[in-house]
Amino acid sequence: MPFALGQRWISDTESELGLGTVVQVEGRMVTVLFPATGENRMFSRNEAPLTRVIYNPGDTVESHEGWSLSVEELTEKDGLVVYHGIHSETGEKVSLRETLLNHNIRFNKPQDRLFAGQIDRLDRFGIRYQCQLLRHQLATSDLLGLQGPRVGLIPHQMWIAHEVGRRYAPRVLLADEVGLGKTIEAGLIIHQQLLTGRAERVLIIVPDTLRHQWLVEMLRRFNLRFSVFDEDRCVEAFADHDNPFYTEQLVICSLELLRKKKRLDQALDADWDLLVVDEAHHLEWTEEAPSRAYQVVEALSEVVPGVLLLTATPDQLGHESHFARLRLLDPDRFYDYDAFLAEENSYKDVAVAAEALAGDAKLSDAAINSLTELLSEKDIAPSIRLIQAEDIDSELQQAARSELLQELLDRHGTGRVLYRNSRASVKGFPKRIFNAYPHAMPEQYLTAARVNEMMGGRKSLEAQAAQALSPEKLYQEFEDNSASWWKFDPRVDWLIEFLKSHRSKKVLIIASGADTALSLEEALRTREGIQATVFHEGMSIIERDKAGAYFAQEEGGAQALICSEIGSEGRNFQFASHLVLFDLPLNPDLLEQRIGRLDRIGQKNDIQIHLPYLQDTAQERLLNWYHQGLNAFELTCPSGHVLYSEFAEDLLNVLVGGDEDELTNLLNHTQSRYKELKHAMEQGRDKLLEINSHGGDKAKAIVERLAQSDQDTKLIGSVIRLWDIIGVDQEDKGENSIILRPSEHMMFPTYPGLHEDGVTVTFDRDTALSRDDIALITQEHPLVQTGLDLITGSDTGTTSVAILKNKALPAGTLFLELIYMADASAPKSSQLYRYLPPTPIRVLLDKNGNDLSAKVDYTSFDKQLSAVNRHIGSKLVTASQPILHPLFAKGEEYAQTAVNELVAQAREKMTSQLTGELDRLESLKAVNPNIREEELEYLRNQMQELSTYLDASQLQLDAIRMVLVSHV
């Protein structure tokens, strides 16, 4: 290479050093000073990884004094270039020697990098283009936010999330029956709102005991990192901000914390976008005396735009409390309880009409009259004729039924604010088969009970009952650790024999306390060497994950998982179908929670519930109350909470020492009250609401599309290539999983979310659902999003030179492939990406400036190309400069035309969709007061904002590939 003192060169391997100056040429070595960093580098003159920096007419260069020069011509003297042109500040003609160029110059634009010889590898150009296409594909999907979470594709859950998650500031009550996944629905909505930019700050309020469960659920299922706030955390955060709630975007806290006026005032002032309240049915309210908890949530709901309330079945705790929760969502709409009751009575006609439309039979005259009256502002006669016709296509009839049903849903009832699915309306649940195993009471327990009675001491009825239900705990209190209750308890003998006879089955065992769980594991291990693992509240999240993964492993995994009551909260093990209840909880809700670990939608097998119990004890009496009084083992019992509240005192007396007559009397009264409550709930079912809540065929269509996305092998290939190019180590672990680890040769110093010890991932949803320790990789996963951002946010792949070996074309034929990005800068919350997401525009020019992109697709063209090394590529670019400059101008013309078309289409789509939705909601508002004025105002403002953003749309050159034909 010809070097001269004062020449400006750039390092091909360390471009961050800026512009270098040749300061010494001696023998076969050259020394370059990089003034921006003050560093020297010495190179061999023949093999220096350096590129000469020479600008061309039309370029703008900056002097070391800060002023710019628009280059008109350049001359050379003694090996140094002198630039001549117009001074940016004075407008005068001036000259600037290259020695006086700004040292801090960076070649960020692709064309600058190309001419500076900063040429990237061929595969990096390809991955950059693929990344831009993936980002565009994700942004344009109307299912954005639904694919990424690690949840089963359950139609009613996806339907509710799809409907609610797309709204501006949704305010809804999620009231599905137990086991139908309210937490998942809330998580899906939160995930959608965050991913689409509709929300940025979220506050979740839960009971104390559920804070950890929500933290785990949000992280494991939705990749959302919430922070748990308690009083200690608030004090600690005060060092960073006067208002501790401003130190995090996503917060979980308990109602107890917010009962304190100081903390509530801070929460009210924290600008939340979305408020989520779990167990909202415990917020007590009467018109005269609302509870403190209710007042806390009411105050927050008045200042937070979006509110999700998660509650038990609305009728479970009475109609007045149901009204109170609706009042939190929209106090203007639900202002008077009596008016609400009167309106609810009018829904009965709507429900009857809806049920008729939802079936297949012809409509009765009464149903037709009812529909005509309910939809009086619309001519429904043509639809009725279609439904009643004899010889007509069934699909047309179904479409007519669906249309009228949608009209009813839009105009009547609480369908926009309340979603409630029941097991009666959602299919796919397994049977619950109950098996009880009586055993004689061990003498050791009887002795411990007598000693305890002699020692006396006043205890509450509840404490006495709890003691009677767990005799092993009482025994252990009187013995030292060398005397283990599990050595003589017949339930342990039974458990060992049961596991030995079901060796091929996974068995979940639940006991009330961690000590009991640990003792059972010790018994199984020491007596029979049975592989079991424990799961209790004293373990960290990582330890629980490992235990869950060990249990889930098909080969070499644990046969049994032994959980404590609290430790099992929030964890589901649908892959198992045998549940052993080693003891019974006193609360029916806790019993349902235990069974709910297996009895979830998505469970493939019938659930076998096994209960070993001690005869003639409190255990047997409680078993009878649950089984004969509530039928709580074989069916869910939504009224369990109410029944326990009503019969708690009688039940506790029976457990502590009641006789047979008292037990019989209790069972009779419980059965009678159970039937009353069940009948009332059946009568209260709102068929119209159920139809709206489960989504029908529309919900199934959403799930089918998501399932197809899961099978997208192109996505899997693109993501694997992305990690390959970044330099992420990938180890095939088997069982559809890969371990990702950072390597020493990664393209970027850090990869956020990829820990030093690695992360196990899978592209298979079923695998991820069965293993808590394996992440589900989709386009929405942070590891994929981060990878896309790392590539597209850097210079990676912005320039490339390739050879096309094709003897049908003359050698030396040049092609210039340009990738432009059409974009409009706007906040994510504006939703502009729905109409004009960042869109890659590909232009493929021949040397005459003709665009061949429509005739030559990217994939087939890319497969024919061969890479060239950087030095040869740089020489080819230098030799081709006279041809390239006019081609760039031509390429921009083609791209600008494409952008103009995209903007016009985006404007038309935006106007059509938002105007249509606005017109629909405005017309509905006249007949359905559930349409909030805020939603209408939001749509009007959004149309104006989006139009302004579209006017400011821009075109940016993102990547360049120069291709030359060779016959060698």
Swiss-Prot record:
Give a yes or no for keyword Transcription regulation in this entry: yes
Name the residues that bind ATP.
D176, E177, V178, G179, L180, G181, K182, T183
The sequence motif named DEAH box is recorded at: 278-281
CDD domains from the entry? DEXDc_RapA, SF2_C_SNF
SUPFAM superfamilies linked = P-loop containing nucleoside triphosphate hydrolases
* Claim: ATP-binding is one of the keywords in the record: yes
**Alphabetical UniProt keywords:** Activator, ATP-binding, DNA-binding, Helicase, Hydrolase, Nucleotide-binding, Transcription, Transcription regulation
Q: Name one GO biological process term.
A: regulation of DNA-templated transcription
Gene Ontology MF: a single term: hydrolase activity, acting on acid anhydrides
Where in this chain does the record put each Helicase ATP-binding domain?
A: 163-332
Q: Which Pfam families does UniProt cross-reference here? A: Helicase_C (PF00271), RapA_C (PF12137), SNF2-rel_dom (PF00176), Tudor_1_RapA (PF18339), Tudor_RapA (PF18337)
Q: What is its EC number?
A: 3.6.4.-
Q: Which residues form the Helicase C-terminal domain?
A: 491-655
The entry's family comment says: Belongs to the SNF2/RAD54 helicase family. RapA subfamily.
The record, for PANTHER family, names: DNA ANNEALING HELICASE AND ENDONUCLEASE ZRANB3 FAMILY MEMBER, SWI_SNF-RELATED MATRIX-ASSOCIATED ACTIN-DEPENDENT REGULATOR OF CHROMATIN SUBFAMILY A-LIKE PROTEIN 1
Q: How does it assemble?
A: Interacts with the RNAP. Has a higher affinity for the core RNAP than for the holoenzyme. Its ATPase activity is stimulated by binding to RNAP.
Which NCBIfam families is this protein grouped with? PRK04914.1 (NF003426)
Name-wise, this protein is RNA polymerase-associated protein RapA
Organism of origin is: Shewanella sp. (strain ANA-3)
Upper lineage is: Bacteria, Pseudomonadati, Pseudomonadota, Gammaproteobacteria, Alteromonadales
Name the gene that codes for it.
rapA
